From Swiss-Prot:
Organism from which the protein derives: Corynebacterium glutamicum (strain ATCC 13032 / DSM 20300 / JCM 1318 / BCRC 11384 / CCUG 27702 / LMG 3730 / NBRC 12168 / NCIMB 10025 / NRRL B-2784 / 534)
UniProt keyword annotations, A-Z: Amino-acid biosynthesis, Histidine biosynthesis, Hydrolase, Methionine biosynthesis, Multifunctional enzyme, NADP, One-carbon metabolism, Oxidoreductase, Purine biosynthesis
Pfam families registered for this protein in UniProt: THF_DHG_CYH (PF00763), THF_DHG_CYH_C (PF02882)
Annotated GO biological process: L-histidine biosynthetic process; methionine biosynthetic process; purine nucleotide biosynthetic process; tetrahydrofolate interconversion
Name recorded for this polypeptide: Bifunctional protein FolD
C-alpha cells in the first residue's frame, strides 16, 4: 500500500484563491490588509521563511511591512519596534519570527504584541482564549494541520490522535484544538517522558509528528491505514528532514510530505488571520 499524499501546496492554492477574492472585496471598500514581520539576526532559515511570507502577501494583494533588526538588538529596542507596530493602523497583524537570539526574552516579546494583531496566534491571551474556546486568532501550524486533514477527508470525530511533541507552537495548542466539539478527537500528547511511544502510535488513527527529530517515526510504529502528519523539521548534514521516515508511506493510509505538507498551510493561515481581522474591522 502506498499512502495518499496530503498535499499542502495543492490546498494552499485553494486557500489563496479564496483569500484573493476576499482581499479584492476589502479593497473595494478602501481597505488594504497589512502583514508585518519582525526579524532579528541573520539566521538563513528565518530569512527564507520571512521572504516566503512576503511573497505570499504580494500574491494575494496584502501589503507587507518588514522590520529587520541586527542580532545584537536590545530588548528595549525590540520593544520599541513592537510598540510601533501595535500603533500602526496600516499593520493589521504581525509576527515576530522565532526563535530569537538567546539574550532576548521570547515570552516577554510575545506578551508585548497587541493580542488583536497577533497573526501567529501565540500571544498568552489568545492561547488562553483557545483553552476557553473563545474566538481569537488560532495558531497557524495547528490550524493548518487540522485543515489539511479535513481537506483530504481524514475522519477526526471520535478518532484517536497521537501528537508527538509538546512545544508551544504545535504540540500543546493542537491538542486543545482537536478536543473541541468541532473536531471531537481523543488526544494523547507524547513527549520525551513517554515510556512506550511505539505502543501509543500503533494504536492511533492519526499521528501528528512534531518533535523535530529526523525520521523518528518509522513504519513499525504506525497502524496500517493511519493518517500521518509530518510537522517537525530538523537539519542533518546540511539537509532539512522531517520527523517521518520514508518507509511510513508503505504502511500509512495518508501522509503529508515534508516539505510540501503542513508548511505551506502555516503560511496560508498566517495571511488568513490577517485578512480575517481586516474583515472584522470593516464589519464584514
Amino acid at each position: 500500500m502506498t499512502a495518499i499524499k496530503l498535499d499542502g501546496n495543492l490546498y494552499r492554492g485553494e486557500i489563496f484563491a479564496d483569500l484573493e477574492q476576499r482581499v479584492a472585496a476589502l479593497k473595494e471598500k478602501g481597505i488594504v490588509p497589512g502583514l508585518a514581520t519582525v526579524l532579528v539576526g541573520d539566521d538563513p532559515a528565518s530569512h527564507s521563511y520571512v521572504k516566503m511570507k512576503h511573497r505570499d502577501c504580494e500574491q494575494i494583494g496584502v501589503n507587507s511591512i518588514r522590520k529587520d533588526l541586527p542580532a545584537d538588538v536590545t530588548q528595549e529596542e525590540l520593544f520599541a519596534v513592537i510598540d510601533e507596530l501595535n500603533n500602526d493602523d496600516s499593520c493589521t497583524g504581525y509576527i515576530v519570527q522565532l526563535p530569537l537570539p538567546k539574550h532576548l526574552d521570547e515570552n516577554a516579546v510575545l506578551e508585548r504584541i497587541d493580542p488583536a494583531k497577533d497573526a501567529d496566534g501565540l500571544h498568552p491571551v489568545n492561547l488562553g482564549k483557545l483553552v476557553l474556546n473563545e474566538p481569537a486568532p488560532l495558531p497557524c501550524t495547528p490550524n493548518g494541520s487540522i485543515s489539511l486533514l479535513r481537506r483530504f477527508g481524514v475522519e477526526l470525530d471520535g478518532a484517536k490522535v497521537v501528537v508527538i511533541g509538546r512545544g508551544v507552537t504545535v504540540g500543546r495548542p493542537i491538542g486543545l484544538m482537536l478536543t473541541r466539539r468541532s473536531e471531537n478527537s481523543t488526544v494523547t500528547l507524547c513527549h520525551t517522558g513517554t515510556k512506550d511511544l511505539a505502543a501509543e502510535t500503533r494504536a492511533a488513527d492519526v499521528i501528528i509528528a512534531a518533535a523535530g527529530q529526523p525520521h523518528m517515526l518509522t513504519a513499525d510504529m504506525v497502524k496500517p491505514g493511519a493518517a500521518v502528519l509530518d510537522v517537525g523539521v530538523s537539519r542533518k548534514d546540511g539537509k532539512l528532514l522531517g520527523d517521518v521516515h520514508p518507509d511510513v508511506w508503505e504502511v500509512a493510509g495518508a501522509v503529508s510530505p515534508n516539505p510540501g505538507g503542513v508548511g505551506p498551510l502555516t503560511r496560508a493561515f498566517l495571511v488568513h488571520n490577517v485578512v480575517e481581522r481586516a474583515e472584522k474591522l470593516a464589519g464584514l
